[in-house]
Protein backbone atom coordinates (compact mmCIF):
# COMPACT_ATOMS: atom_id res chain seq x y z
CA UNK A 1 0.00 0.00 0.00
CA UNK A 2 1.51 3.30 -1.09
CA UNK A 3 -1.38 5.59 -0.30
CA UNK A 4 -5.03 5.40 0.56
CA UNK A 5 -7.78 7.65 -0.74
CA UNK A 6 -10.84 8.58 1.27
CA UNK A 7 -14.24 8.04 -0.23
CA UNK A 8 -16.85 10.76 -0.33
CA UNK A 9 -20.63 10.76 -0.16
CA UNK A 10 -21.79 13.49 -2.52
CA UNK A 11 -25.10 15.09 -3.47
CA UNK A 12 -26.00 17.68 -6.12
CA UNK A 13 -26.05 21.29 -4.91
CA UNK A 14 -29.86 21.38 -4.94
CA UNK A 15 -30.26 18.19 -2.89
CA UNK A 16 -32.51 18.54 0.16
CA UNK A 17 -29.93 16.66 2.26
CA UNK A 18 -27.64 19.02 4.14
CA UNK A 19 -25.73 16.39 6.09
CA UNK A 20 -25.08 12.67 5.98
CA UNK A 21 -27.59 11.91 8.73
CA UNK A 22 -30.44 13.55 6.81
CA UNK A 23 -29.52 11.47 3.76
CA UNK A 24 -29.31 8.28 5.82
CA UNK A 25 -32.74 8.86 7.39
CA UNK A 26 -34.33 9.29 3.96
CA UNK A 27 -32.38 6.32 2.59
CA UNK A 28 -33.61 4.09 5.41
CA UNK A 29 -37.20 4.93 4.49
CA UNK A 30 -36.69 4.23 0.78
CA UNK A 31 -33.45 2.37 -0.06
CA UNK A 32 -34.69 1.43 -3.53
CA UNK A 33 -35.97 4.92 -4.34
CA UNK A 34 -32.80 6.77 -3.36
CA UNK A 35 -30.39 5.37 -5.90
CA UNK A 36 -26.68 5.67 -5.29
CA UNK A 37 -24.14 5.70 -8.08
CA UNK A 38 -20.50 4.78 -8.16
CA UNK A 39 -17.75 4.88 -10.74
CA UNK A 40 -16.77 1.22 -10.54
CA UNK A 41 -18.23 -2.17 -11.34
CA UNK A 42 -20.08 -4.22 -8.75
CA UNK A 43 -17.45 -5.48 -6.34
CA UNK A 44 -15.24 -2.43 -6.87
CA UNK A 45 -14.61 0.24 -4.23
CA UNK A 46 -17.39 2.59 -5.37
CA UNK A 47 -19.83 -0.31 -5.01
CA UNK A 48 -18.47 -1.64 -1.73
CA UNK A 49 -18.57 1.78 -0.06
CA UNK A 50 -22.36 2.33 -0.26
CA UNK A 51 -23.02 -1.33 0.56
CA UNK A 52 -20.90 -1.06 3.70
CA UNK A 53 -22.50 2.28 4.53
CA UNK A 54 -25.95 0.72 4.16
CA UNK A 55 -24.97 -2.11 6.48
CA UNK A 56 -23.47 0.32 9.02
CA UNK A 57 -26.72 2.29 9.24
CA UNK A 58 -29.05 -0.71 9.34
CA UNK A 59 -30.10 -0.98 5.70
CA UNK A 60 -30.00 -4.40 4.04
CA UNK A 61 -27.44 -3.98 1.23
CA UNK A 62 -29.66 -6.17 -0.97
CA UNK A 63 -32.32 -3.45 -0.78
CA UNK A 64 -29.97 -0.74 -2.10
CA UNK A 65 -30.43 0.56 -5.63
CA UNK A 66 -26.84 0.88 -6.90
CA UNK A 67 -26.10 2.22 -10.37
CA UNK A 68 -22.67 1.36 -11.74
CA UNK A 69 -20.95 3.89 -13.99
CA UNK A 70 -17.78 3.51 -16.00
CA UNK A 71 -15.70 5.86 -13.88
CA UNK A 72 -16.19 9.38 -12.61
CA UNK A 73 -16.66 10.73 -16.12
CA UNK A 74 -20.06 9.02 -16.28
CA UNK A 75 -20.88 9.28 -12.58
CA UNK A 76 -20.74 13.08 -12.37
CA UNK A 77 -23.24 13.83 -15.17
CA UNK A 78 -25.62 11.28 -13.63
CA UNK A 79 -25.32 13.00 -10.26
CA UNK A 80 -25.64 16.50 -11.72
CA UNK A 81 -28.59 15.37 -13.84
CA UNK A 82 -30.39 13.89 -10.82
CA UNK A 83 -30.39 10.37 -12.26
CA UNK A 84 -29.15 9.25 -8.83
CA UNK A 85 -29.77 10.72 -5.38
CA UNK A 86 -26.15 10.56 -4.29
CA UNK A 87 -22.75 9.36 -5.37
CA UNK A 88 -20.00 7.40 -3.67
CA UNK A 89 -16.44 7.52 -4.97
CA UNK A 90 -12.97 8.73 -4.13
CA UNK A 91 -13.06 12.35 -2.98
CA UNK A 92 -10.70 13.40 -5.79
CA UNK A 93 -13.38 12.62 -8.38
CA UNK A 94 -15.47 15.51 -7.09
CA UNK A 95 -13.04 18.29 -6.16
CA UNK A 96 -13.57 20.45 -9.26
CA UNK A 97 -17.34 20.25 -8.89
CA UNK A 98 -17.11 20.99 -5.16
CA UNK A 99 -15.03 24.08 -5.88
CA UNK A 100 -17.50 25.14 -8.60
CA UNK A 101 -20.40 24.72 -6.15
CA UNK A 102 -22.13 22.06 -8.26
CA UNK A 103 -22.02 19.31 -5.61
CA UNK A 104 -21.74 19.04 -1.85
CA UNK A 105 -19.76 16.43 0.04
CA UNK A 106 -21.77 15.25 3.04
CA UNK A 107 -19.03 13.08 4.56
CA UNK A 108 -15.65 11.56 3.88
CA UNK A 109 -14.93 7.97 4.77
CA UNK A 110 -11.41 8.17 6.19
CA UNK A 111 -10.45 8.13 9.86
CA UNK A 112 -9.43 11.79 9.68
CA UNK A 113 -10.77 14.74 7.72
CA UNK A 114 -9.30 15.32 4.28
CA UNK A 115 -7.15 18.46 3.92
CA UNK A 116 -8.80 19.40 0.61
CA UNK A 117 -12.24 19.19 2.28
CA UNK A 118 -11.41 20.34 5.80
CA UNK A 119 -14.97 21.48 6.59
CA UNK A 120 -16.44 18.08 5.69
CA UNK A 121 -16.90 15.65 8.61
CA UNK A 122 -15.91 12.02 8.58
CA UNK A 123 -18.58 9.35 8.85
CA UNK A 124 -17.38 8.60 12.38
CA UNK A 125 -17.71 12.26 13.38
CA UNK A 126 -21.28 12.03 12.09
CA UNK A 127 -22.02 9.03 14.31
CA UNK A 128 -21.63 6.32 11.65
CA UNK A 129 -19.17 3.59 12.58
CA UNK A 130 -17.49 3.08 9.22
CA UNK A 131 -14.07 3.83 7.82
CA UNK A 132 -13.43 3.03 4.16
CA UNK A 133 -10.40 3.93 2.07
CA UNK A 134 -9.21 2.77 -1.31
CA UNK A 135 -5.63 1.59 -1.29
CA UNK A 136 -3.27 2.41 -4.13
CA UNK A 137 -0.16 0.38 -4.78
CA UNK A 138 2.24 -0.96 -7.36
CA UNK A 139 2.39 -4.51 -8.66
CA UNK A 140 5.11 -6.24 -10.61
CA UNK A 141 5.00 -9.23 -12.92
CA UNK A 142 5.75 -12.71 -11.62
CA UNK A 143 9.42 -13.56 -11.70
CA UNK A 144 10.73 -10.04 -11.17
CA UNK A 145 14.39 -10.20 -10.22
CA UNK A 146 15.47 -9.36 -6.70
CA UNK A 147 17.56 -6.52 -8.15
CA UNK A 148 14.58 -4.97 -9.96
CA UNK A 149 12.40 -5.50 -6.91
CA UNK A 150 14.94 -3.63 -4.77
CA UNK A 151 15.01 -0.74 -7.27
CA UNK A 152 11.24 -0.33 -7.04
CA UNK A 153 11.15 -0.65 -3.27
CA UNK A 154 13.85 2.02 -2.99
CA UNK A 155 11.94 4.29 -5.37
CA UNK A 156 8.79 4.18 -3.26
CA UNK A 157 10.20 4.17 0.26
Per-region residue spans from a language model:
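Hinge/capping helix and adjacent helix->loop/strand transition within the periplasmic-binding protein
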Residues: 1-74, 135-157
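Structured helix-beta-strand junction loops
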Residues: 5, 30-33, 82-83, 100-102, ...
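C-terminal lobe and pocket-closing loops
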Residues: 18, 93-157
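Residue-level signature of catalytic and energy-coupling elements of molecular machines
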Residues: 23, 79, 123
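Short helices/loops that flank or line small-molecule/ion binding pockets
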Residues: 27, 52, 73-87, 92-102
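Short, well-ordered secondary-structure micro-motifs
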Residues: 48-49, 76-77, 117-121
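Short beta-strand and adjacent tight-turn residues that come in two discontinuous sequence segments
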Residues: 69, 88-89, 108
Amino acid sequence: KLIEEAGAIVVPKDSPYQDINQLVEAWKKDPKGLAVGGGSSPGGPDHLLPMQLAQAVGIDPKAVSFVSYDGGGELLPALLGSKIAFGASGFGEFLDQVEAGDVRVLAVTSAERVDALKDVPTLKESGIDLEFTNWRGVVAPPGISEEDKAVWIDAFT
